[in-house]
Amino acid sequence: KASVGFKAGVKDYKLTYYTPEYETKDTDILAAFRVTPQPGVPPEEAGAAVAAESSTGTWTTVWTDGLTSLDRYKGRCYHIEPVAGEENQFIAYVAYPLDLFEEGSVTNMFTSIVGNVFGFKALRALRLEDLRIPPAYVKTFQGPPHGIQVERDKLNKYVRPLLGCTIKPKLGLSAKNYGRAVYECLRGGLDFTKDDENVNSQPFMRWRDRFLFCAEALYKAQAETGEIKGHYLNATAGTCEEMLKRAIFARELGVPIVMHDYLTGGFTANTSLAHYCRDNGLLLHIHRAMHAVIDRQKNHGIHFRVLAKALRMSGGDHIHSGTVVGKLEGERDITLGFVDLLRDDFVEKDRSRGIYFTQDWVSLPGILPVASGGIHVWHMPALTEIFGDDSVLQFGGGTLGHPWGNAPGAVANRVALEACVQARNEGRDLAREGNEIIREASKWSPELAAACEVWKEIKF
């Protein structure tokens, strides 16, 4: 008689991994998944399957389970609630013991939590809505290279949002002409200009030429305005070694900031670059190219607030966060929810803003949200009100599309911003009086008046 000392076969996940009586620990990583089970699969089984497949489980019982303590290491689905207004959708809450994750590795955290489970047959769809990162795990990350306060001190710019501009056309300019556009924008009054996310090192403009001409533009604009200026030099490359080579060259030129596409570049590369930037005094601007592939579907994928939290752990000083302006009111609350998760040290659970867990960042530096995409001077009051001082407002077409050229476009944006900040400080209501504030300012700024005229037809 052969006895192997364990019961072979396939058993329901919920027998092991659904534990509604479990009390979460302060050291657990908590996840909120939006689960859409296949017809006939009970939500408890679906939630337990997610917990199992993203932690210690496999599809059948294995004898090596007896060589470890599953109770210590398994993920647990500890609560399930139906999603209001959606048929057959549930929020499954899963707790993971901290021992399952390598310290200081966003890569490992995601490989575990979202690595395999999304292709699971028992589920029609699955979306990771939020993560609670416990302080014990947060403390294993360096986080942003510098954070909001250090950035302000480096740039000597306070009590207002920062202004940026993406250089367009994004592909096709020679390095010399590119540098010229950078100079004109910075000279006109912007704080930053930006490489587009897909500007790396192409035949029409190799990275080293671009870096040199942009640095020249930067120093010329600084000398003429007396303000510190920056251009986000995109260091994203095909290998980590090449990426760091570009960052090192930027540091040798003495520029203040470099840039990385963190999703296409990957978290491992991003964390390496963030460490280099802190060690060498460079700020790090992060672009989220590819995010919509992951976060756009409402019932499948990963919500951007999770990608934003992951970036704060991996490291970056700025990240693109959408604009809110002109979108629906509900979107505004959700966006401001993850903007707070980027900037603040402690964020309370607030389901109306999409925040499923209270998050304590235990003094990990904050990140400036970057509002960019289809915005112009008429949006300035709303942007100033919504995002507040700790933000970067980026106008690409809204600068370079000015009828008189790049420098006047920059002047128009700077005048509009200063007018909005002054009006706010005087106690005026930007939401109600915004258009009036811009009109008043345009009376003494012909550049702003021309910008107002060009974009007056474009409604919020």
UniProtKB/Swiss-Prot annotation:
Site positions per UniProt: Transition state stabilizer: 327
EC class (word): lyase
Alphabetic keyword roster: Calvin cycle, Carbon dioxide fixation, Chloroplast, Disulfide bond, Lyase, Magnesium, Metal-binding, Methylation, Monooxygenase, Oxidoreductase, Photorespiration, Photosynthesis, Plastid
Assembly, per entry: Heterohexadecamer of 8 large chains and 8 small chains; disulfide-linked. The disulfide link is formed within the large subunit homodimers.
Modified residues (N6,N6,N6-trimethyllysine): 7
The organism's place on the tree of life at top rank: Eukaryota
Protein name in UniProt: Ribulose bisphosphate carboxylase large chain
